[in-house]
């Protein structure tokens, strides 16, 4: 099995890391590098009142935000500008994969990838409507230069007493390595962190079940669980239910265990949001043991 080497980094707006695949088996070998990112797009709604339950009325010209074409275009520009800065010296064409959340529909992603700041990357869109009460979904953008799409499935979280986002599992080939990307936006902390924790634990259990079902069919497939998890790496949903480890060595060579590179990022005082003068790192990318090699990045 080809291994992918990961180096972790955190952005204020996204969780992201880079992966590299050896081009040959020699020492001092050259590698191919691709970036993987997650970005909560924070209520990316169009201006059209097209939800039959009126869940999008807030983001319409007549709604409380007076969400008109100018504001929508400005938001698209700002998001595209931020994404355009996801490039590095080794990934000049941007990330291979960008998981996203808080989007109203597919059309807003089509509008986003058409923005001049990132249109040259030729990003493709993967999206599926969810039953979420606010009318927001998850999605995925990918660059066909790096990633070849094979299959997409959607998984409903039925173990909670409300409508929330589906989990989307995107399977394909990244730098020749077969991978599955499970894009998430887990239930919020409304009602309190402790009181709402069972909802996120249920979401984590669903992600774990999806991964296990993939491995029953293909034991060598690499799995990435990414998203706005509304929990930190050390919280029960991530550390206990998923069993995502802080240190690669704690996997003890288990190809189907999970490693969370963002745990150490949070330990360094870096987060993706702050609340009551304390950083949280809800936006994470968690990877399976068969996508790791060597020591902690």
Annotated model-derived regions:
Residues 7-16:
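Bacterial N-terminal signal peptides
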Residues 39-41, 67-68, 72-75, 79, ...:
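Active-site beta-strand/loop signature of hydrolases that rely on acidic residues for catalysis
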Residues 52-55, 177, 181-196:
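Active-site His/acidic residue clusters
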Residues 61-72, 94-100, 127-128, 157-158, ...:
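Second-shell loop/turn segments in exported
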Residues 103-187:
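Structured beta-strand-rich core segments of catalytic domains in phosphoester-bond hydrolases
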């Amino acid at each position: 099995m080809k291994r992918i080497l990961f180096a972790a980094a955190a952005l204020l707006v996204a969780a992201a890391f880079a992966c590299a695949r050896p081009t040959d088996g020699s020492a001092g070998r050259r590698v191919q590098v691709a970036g993987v990112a997650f970005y909560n797009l924070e209520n990316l709604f169009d201006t059209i009142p097209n939800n039959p339950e009126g869940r999008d009325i807030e983001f319409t010209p007549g709604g409380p935000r007076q969400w008109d074409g100018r504001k929508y275009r400005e938001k698209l520009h700002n998001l595209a500008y931020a994404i355009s800065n996801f490039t590095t010296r080794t990934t000049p064409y941007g990330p291979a994969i960008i998981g996203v959340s808080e989007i109203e529909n597919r059309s807003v992603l089509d509008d986003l990838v058409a923005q001049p700041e990132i249109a040259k990357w030729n990003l493709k869109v993967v999206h599926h409507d969810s039953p979420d009460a606010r009318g927001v979904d998850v999605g995925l953008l990918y660059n066909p230069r790096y990633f070849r799409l094979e299959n997409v499935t959607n998984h409903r979280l039925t173990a909670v007493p409300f409508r929330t986002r589906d989990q989307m599992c995107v399977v394909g080939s990244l730098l020749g390595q077969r991978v599955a990307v499970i894009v998430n936006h887990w239930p919020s902390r409304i009602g309190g962190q402790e009181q709402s924790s069972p909802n996120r634990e249920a979401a984590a259990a669903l992600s774990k079940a999806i991964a296990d079902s993939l491995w029953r069919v293909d034991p060598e497939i690499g799995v990435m669980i990414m998203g706005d998890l509304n929990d930190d790496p050390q919280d029960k949903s991530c550390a206990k239910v998923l069993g995502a480890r802080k240190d690669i060595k704690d996997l003890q060579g288990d190809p189907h265990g999970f490693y969370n590179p963002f745990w150490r990022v949070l330990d360094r005082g870096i987060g993706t949001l702050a609340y009551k003068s304390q950083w949280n790192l809800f936006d994470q990318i968690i990877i399976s043991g068969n996508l790791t090699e060597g020591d902690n990045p």
